[in-house]
Amino acid sequence: MIVTTVALASCGSKAADSPPPTISPAQAAVSPAATEAPAGSVRPLAGRGEAVVFDVATSSSVVLNSDAAGGSALVTFPVTGPSRTVALPSPARAIVGDGSGTVYAATKGGYFTVNLGTGDAVARFDVDGENDTDFTAITRRADGKIVLGSASGAVYTLSSATAVGARLQIFARVDALVAEGDTVAVLDRGQTSVTTVDPSGSRQQHALRAGEGATTMAADPEGRILVADTRGQALLVFGTDPLMLRQQYPVPGAPFALAGSSRLAWVSQTATNTVVGYDLATGIPVEKVRYRTVQQPNSMTYDDKTGTLFVVSGSGAGVQVIPGAGS
């Protein structure tokens, strides 16, 4: 097995006049039917899980769920106790939480906020002048500013709940956003690239190629950016100050879902219904544990306090709960 640790220079800090040529975006593998019982327990979820976050204040995982008719809902799964479903007024594409009881969901023209404490307090915020914009990604910076990404390749940094403070249009598409402090990392599947945007929101800091077909991105508590190179069958680990590829490790089985924790980086293998925990502390990822999962493990989150890993099926097979994962 070959392990590669690479440090790359930035592709440049100046914004490009137009996006470079794109490739066909990579996707998760279509998982086979599960042939072994998943680790832990499985809680039912009617529909397809699209994304998941963990909210520390309510000790709950929150799943963005879609139904056959195209509607969206947030389904909250406490570590203990029954789940709760909150229907959203229109389809949502991505979610982020503040860890303090509020979840933000990107939708066409703006975003929703959901108060997890009450469960039914849904508010909509329309971004000024962007009624027809298809927002596909969302994150929240350390200073509380909301940042949205669009299908047309723009990143919007809001200066208030609805006002656009800065707009950066240099991407082919925006598939995921992750905030490290007030710096935002952008994943573009079409360019298979990771780019950091400065705190003003108006300037690209650095941009790097991300493997052969990057699909997902997550942050860990150590300030690292994890990226799944699904087409290239690898886990990529980036530092952010400056943006630099620090680790590249082969992960077979169409790696896709990611979750960072204080001890391990979690990667799902969608071709085999498996999740693997890697220790990144030595500079070379070391496999520490693996679990069988629900079919189509397309999204994950982790509760560091209880050591619980939540694996969400993208095919309707439910939400898998693995207590003490990695211990």
What do these predicted ranges mean?
Residues 1-3:
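Sec-dependent N-terminal signal peptides
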